[in-house]
């Protein structure tokens, strides 16, 4: 089962929490969910060059707090904060609440699965050899402390007439282990031969305590890198 399911969805409530954090009754739930979808669509469209990996939406009383996880926070903020003010106004037009936008810097984008997948997709669009792009991403992740990484590329790779799937793995990626801290990201490359799909799994270690916020806490403390299992056992 762990081989097929989205590893983030499988671990929700165990060592990973939701990206939309709010409660609503039946009357408002659909409206707020639709607002979340529109907010994410607009932000991803406006911040294509900002390397946005994740958008977290929280709704305290009569407010909407949006946290943007980006590898290039300067692009999000803009000159003297002009760009972020425009984003705040656009989000405020969608929702009737007061909008607060926070930005979290991703210090090691090579260890973020979404950013790695998008980087490979961009290289495929520039006609870089897919094996070279995959190998370069794997080496960068392992050098910066990942315990394992797996990359799948599928489609008409290299302009081949028959679509196929190629994969590359280094280290261990235990998809069945629920305590494993596994990041997962997907991206699509729009090439002249058609679309190519990219999937990335990055194993950053094990989270021994049962805490849905554990992954977020470790990313904020360690810049995207989880402590090794040995150091966690010593601390316990």
From Swiss-Prot:
Q: Which GO terms describe its biological process?
A: translation
Disordered, as annotated region: 213-236
In terms of InterPro entries, this protein maps to: KH_dom (IPR004087), KH_dom-like_a/b (IPR015946), KH_dom_type_2 (IPR004044), KH_sf_prok-type (IPR009019), Ribosomal_S3_C_sf (IPR036419), Ribosomal_uS3_bac-typ (IPR005704), Ribosomal_uS3_C (IPR001351), Ribosomal_uS3_CS (IPR018280)
Q: Mind naming one GO cellular-component term on file for this protein? A: cytosolic small ribosomal subunit
Q: Name one Pfam family in it.
A: KH_2
Domain KH type-2 per the UniProt entry, residue ranges: 39-107
Q: Which UniProt keywords apply?
A: Ribonucleoprotein, Ribosomal protein, RNA-binding, rRNA-binding
Query: GO molecular-function annotation terms?
Result: mRNA binding; rRNA binding; structural constituent of ribosome
Q: Sorted alphabetically, which SUPFAM superfamilies does this protein's record hold?
A: Prokaryotic type KH domain (KH-domain type II) (SSF54814), Ribosomal protein S3 C-terminal domain (SSF54821)
- What is its biological role? Binds the lower part of the 30S subunit head. Binds mRNA in the 70S ribosome, positioning it for translation.
Assembly, per entry: Part of the 30S ribosomal subunit. Forms a tight complex with proteins S10 and S14.
Entry-linked PANTHER family: 30S/40S RIBOSOMAL PROTEIN S3 (PTHR11760), SMALL RIBOSOMAL SUBUNIT PROTEIN US3C (PTHR11760:SF19)
Q: What is this protein called?
A: Small ribosomal subunit protein uS3
Organism for this UniProt entry: Bradyrhizobium sp. (strain ORS 278)
